[in-house]
Amino acid sequence: MGRKKIQITRIMDERNRQVTFTKRKFGLMKKAYELSVLCDCEIALIIFNSSNKLFQYASTDMDKVLLKYTEYNEPHESRTNSDIVEALNKKEHRGCDSPDPDTSYVLTPHTEEKYKKINEEFDNMMRNHKIAPGLPPQNFSMSVTVPVTSPNALSYTNPGSSLVSPSLAASSTLTDSSMLSPPQTTLHRNVSPGAPQRPPSTGNAGGMLSTTDLTVPNGAGSSPVGNGFVNSRASPNLIGATGANSLGKVMPTKSPPPPGGGNLGMNSRKPDLRVVIPPSSKGMMPPLSEEEELELNTQRISSSQATQPLATPVVSVTTPSLPPQGLVYSAMPTAYNTDYSLTSADLSALQGFNSPGMLSLGQVSAWQQHHLGQAALSSLVAGGQLSQGSNLSINTNQNISIKSEPISPPRDRMTPSGFQQQQQQQQQQQPPPPPQPQPQPPQPQPRQEMGRSPVDSLSSSSSSYDGSDREDPRGDFHSPIVLGRPPNTEDRESPSVKRMRMDAWVT
């Protein structure tokens, strides 16, 4: 906004009048100079102030200009103050340019009133429409971009089948400044006894690391729940430990899965919400098979019919500098433990939800009753491995005795050699099997084999069941905790075959 114009009347204050005279006199002479140079003319100014003091300005020589003036007898333009005021009024009403070359501003009462009205309107607008102060920036420990169509589009709260509280689901909308860090290293679960047992479904799990919809930390002792969050319940008996930077948080998908069995290829599926996992943490999360993934999608879609859909985003989770242990969701406090405990009805709604590292439902109650794992599993949380000489004997419905054998001395992270020593100690306590022809060792797969190597995936295993291998083409994966599968002859393999698989893991 330009300089505020004053009313053109006589200034009553002597000091202000003198200052105004000095400034405007110089301004008038400056304009006269510009006009003389620009338009090639001669200008003479004669000014007498209120005290009759003379001030004059001439573009060349005052006497020369005055001589021309006295000798000039032709008709010419002569203006006074009244002429200037009249010219300004015509300009204001007609909107045309004033023929007056004088640049001094003359404000009429009508013009002054208009300026006052404009100033009042501007002041009222500034008072009524104040700019809201900027919100403080929200600091997160890692970058998670979740574009959604609505702020509450991630809250799936169907009480019949959804097993995740609204507060936990709403925490993924990133509306508060809570620290969003990888999941808890101690994952708990409250499971009601008496639920039917289901063996884990098998299927083709190859190539699922980059497009899987749910990744459960291996050996965490927990199963997937309604919309993909790993359930965090307060059960002191079921304590698992995930590896470094393992992420178990998955958003629900938008489109329902296509009908069919577990042998559908990944190319036939519509692009769902995926978790892009950095390479440093891919090896710690064995993916679900295709059949389990389809069942999980069906359950999530059935539990979220009344909610708003997602915009099919891709969640990028990068954890470049997070410590190996001690990573918890601060947005999932233990205050939700008593409010959202699972019942048998909720568990029966989970049709076929059995991840490779899941505890079957019948044996979970035995874990809760006998209070097992306080020594061995607490060492899992601290170092990601079992302590020396810790034994776990669990009697389940199928009379399977599972023991954890002593392993190599504790390290920061279990190495392939330490895993071989554990397997060799288990094999030494078994009777020697009949000799079998040594099969051709398989060629190591460069990326997918290492993605599911026991270096990371079995760092949290609390027991090793002889015969719990997955029946899938990826024979190099040993499920760390599978208590509900009945042993059969197909699963039992000789130690030589396992030794061959361990050689493939090491590479």
From Swiss-Prot:
Modified residues (Phosphothreonine): 312, 319, 415
Residues where N6-acetyllysine is found: 249, 403
Reported tissue expression: Isoform MEF2 and isoform MEFA are expressed only in skeletal and cardiac muscle and in the brain. Isoform RSRFC4 and isoform RSRFC9 are expressed in all tissues examined.
Nucleotide-binding as UniProt keyword: no
Entries under SUPFAM superfamilies matching the protein: SRF-like
Biased composition (Polar residues): 209-229
GO cellular component term, pick one: chromatin
Annotated InterPro entries: HJURP_C (IPR022102), MEF2-like_N (IPR033896), TF_MADSbox (IPR002100), TF_MADSbox_sf (IPR036879)
Region (Beta domain): 289-296
Subcellular localization(s) per the UniProt record: Nucleus
Region (Required for interaction with MAPKs): 266-283
Outcome after substituting residue 275 to A: Reduced p38 alpha- and beta2-mediated transcriptional activity
Chain positions of cross-link Glycyl lysine isopeptide (Lys-Gly) (interchain with G-Cter in SUMO): 403
Swiss-Prot/TrEMBL GO biological process terms: apoptotic process; cardiac conduction; cell differentiation; cellular response to calcium ion; dendrite morphogenesis; DNA-templated transcription; ERK5 cascade; heart development
Biased composition annotated in UniProt, kind: Pro residues: 430-445
Entry-linked CDD domains: MADS_MEF2_like (cd00265)
Statement: the UniProt record of this protein carries the keyword rRNA processing: no
Segments forming domain MADS-box: 3-57
Pfam families: HJURP_C (PF12347), SRF-TF (PF00319)
Compositional bias annotation for Low complexity: 173-183, 420-429, 453-466
Outcome following mutation: residue 355 to A: No effect on p38-mediated transcriptional activity
Main function: Transcriptional activator which binds specifically to the MEF2 element, 5'-YTA[AT](4)TAR-3', found in numerous muscle-specific genes. Also involved in the activation of numerous growth factor- and stress-induced genes. Mediates cellular functions not only in skeletal and cardiac muscle development, but also in neuronal differentiation and survival. Plays diverse roles in the control of cell growth, survival and apoptosis via p38 MAPK signaling in muscle-specific and/or growth factor-related transcription.
Protein family membership: Belongs to the MEF2 family.
Disease: Coronary artery disease, autosomal dominant, 1: A common heart disease characterized by reduced or absent blood flow in one or more of the arteries that encircle and supply the heart. Its most important complication is acute myocardial infarction.
Protein name: Myocyte-specific enhancer factor 2A
Source organism of this protein record: Homo sapiens (Human)
